[in-house]
Each structure stands twice: as C-alpha cells, then as structure tokens.
C-alpha cells in the first residue's frame, strides 16, 4: 500500500462487457535531472472529499491525494492515454471524466 500526491491527475473511466471502472491517471514531473513518471491506479473504491483535494482509495489499498488545482494531463500522460485509445478491445470505451463525482 502506498500514498501518492501527483503533480497532475485525471480520472479515466473504462467501460467493457465486464463493467465500468474508474482509475486515477497520475503524473509527476522529473525536474532537471529526473525523468517524468506516470502511474495508473488499480481502481477507485471510494473517495474522500477534503478541503482542496480528493483522496482516492483504490483496490490495492493505495491512496492518491489529488489537489483540485492540479487536475489535467502532462504531455507524457496525454501521449499514454491516446496510445491506449488506439488499442481498445472492440466494444470497450475509455474516457476522461471531466467533472468527478462518485456516481
């Protein structure tokens, strides 16, 4: 179990014949000497709405504290997301959840 605080984040939703899943697509800037990083959470189980942030709890036990002013994608995660769109199984959909709620 790990706790993450990403530099940028979005919620992605997948719909397949097996059901609907929402996950955090998170990224961190590497800075001058580091590499940018990204991570896709295991699947949101519940959300805490705290002042200025959401804390997303996931199937793996990990949490992502996502600051409201940091919602969005880096170029790195934008490219990753669009590469997934190209290889979706037939009948499956993948989308970015623009305004998050726990529906």
Predicted segments, located by residue:
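Cysteine-centric segments in proteins
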Residues: 1-103
């Amino acid at each position: 179990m790990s706790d993450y605080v990403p530099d940028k984040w979005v919620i992605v939703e997948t719909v397949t014949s097996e059901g609907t899943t929402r996950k955090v697509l998170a990224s961190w800037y590497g800075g001058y000497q580091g590499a940018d990083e990204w991570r896709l959470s295991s699947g949101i189980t519940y959300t805490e709405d705290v002042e200025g942030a959401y804390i997303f709890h996931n199937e793996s036990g990990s949490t992502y504290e996502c600051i409201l002013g940091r919602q969005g994608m880096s170029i790195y995660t934008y490219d990753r997301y669009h590469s997934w769109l190209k290889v979706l199984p037939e009948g499956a959909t993948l989308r970015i959840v623009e305004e998050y709620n726990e529906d």
